[in-house]
């Protein structure tokens, strides 16, 4: 792992109200320990509904400006290594002048809009999300979106958004979490600007995606440090993580060129870094 470049496109801070403990200090230690070259980080404090799709009480919510400010401050401490996906709140907020200015003034580190159709229970093609897609188009940002777990988060809705906005790169995070990924795999081939990531996706599914569509459709992502400092190696129970195969031996399965695309180059291209 010491000689490879890794761009983890799915890293988090925050999330206390969802039961997570993901601090900037933990992420900093993690990327040093595992020699991660670059990361794209989003702040889970922007969640609007809980794991049961119940609204998080307003007194416990963090507005999207404060959430983004925390992520920006973290990225500024790690120049050219930490980039930001701005996790937005379409269920209860809108784009204000202040929010757009914050995006515009930090385009050197903000590289994506983060949608979470589960934790906002709002589809990417819901009218409340459209202004955020317009914002991504205006500032040439990618859109990374959770898929899976509820109807609003179905991969088909991200595909619909990709068709509507062909200028925006869309990343299907999880490829349909909790499914066999078949729907997401099929959708990958239907839009040139639609991509997948490896977060909780088995390596054989990623290999199949590469066999079906070539090496430029999948990005490495992990949800780190959701299972702790060593998410790349172990899950919360101490059993081997799904990411071990990606980091140890997967290069032999898909070839050097495809491996470099998956683990580093695709994210650099899609996020423009």
Residue ranges and their predicted role:
Residues 10, 31, 71, 102, ...:
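Conserved, mostly hydrophobic/aromatic
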Residues 34-60, 107-110, 168, 224-228, ...:
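Active-site gating loops and adjacent loop-to-helix segments of metal-dependent hydrolytic enzymes
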Residues 1-69:
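An N-terminally biased module of ancient metal coordination in phosphate/nucleic-acid-related enzymes
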Residues 94-104, 123-132, 151-165, 180-188, ...:
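Distinct, well-ordered alpha-helical segments
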Residues 169, 176-273:
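H/E-rich (His + Asp/Glu) clusters that bind or coordinate divalent metals
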Residues 14-16, 46-49, 90-94, 120, ...:
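Active-site environment of divalent metal-dependent phosphoester hydrolases
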Residues 54-144, 194-195:
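Active-site gating/metal-coordination segments in enzymes
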Residues 6-11, 39-41, 82-86, 111-115, ...:
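Hydrophobic faces of well-ordered beta-strands that scaffold small-molecule active sites
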């Amino acid at each position: 792992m010491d000689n490879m470049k890794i761009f983890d496109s799915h890293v988090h801070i925050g999330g206390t109200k969802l039961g997570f403990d993901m601090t900037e200090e933990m992420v900093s230690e993690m990327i040093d320990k595992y020699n991660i070259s670059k990361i794209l980080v989003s702040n889970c404090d922007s969640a609007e509904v809980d794991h049961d799709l119940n609204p998080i009480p307003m007194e416990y919510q963090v507005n999207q400006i404060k959430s983004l400010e925390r992520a920006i401050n973290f990225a500024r401490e790690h120049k050219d290594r930490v980039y930001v996906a701005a996790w937005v709140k379409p269920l209860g907020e809108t784009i204000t002048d202040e929010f757009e200015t914050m995006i515009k003034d930090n385009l050197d580190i903000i590289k994506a809009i983060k949608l979470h159709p589960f934790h906002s229970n709002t589809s990417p093609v819901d009218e409340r999300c459209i202004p955020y897609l317009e914002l991504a188009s205006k500032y040439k940002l990618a859109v990374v979106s959770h898929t899976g777990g509820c109807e609003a988060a179905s991969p088909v809705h991200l595909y619909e958004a990709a068709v509507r906005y062909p200028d925006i790169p869309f990343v299907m995070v999880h490829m349909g979490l909790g499914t066999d990924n078949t729907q997401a795999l099929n959708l990958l081939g239907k839009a040139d600007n639609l991509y997948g990531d490896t977060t909780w996706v088995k390596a054989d599914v990623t290999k199949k995606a590469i066999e079906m569509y070539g090496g430029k459709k999948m990005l490495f992502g992990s949800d780190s440090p959701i299972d702790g400092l060593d998410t790349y190696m172990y899950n919360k129970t101490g059993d081997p993580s799904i990411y071990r195969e990606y980091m140890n031996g997967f290069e032999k399965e898909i070839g050097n060129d495809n491996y470099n695309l998956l683990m580093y180059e695709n994210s650099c291209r899609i996020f423009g870094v």
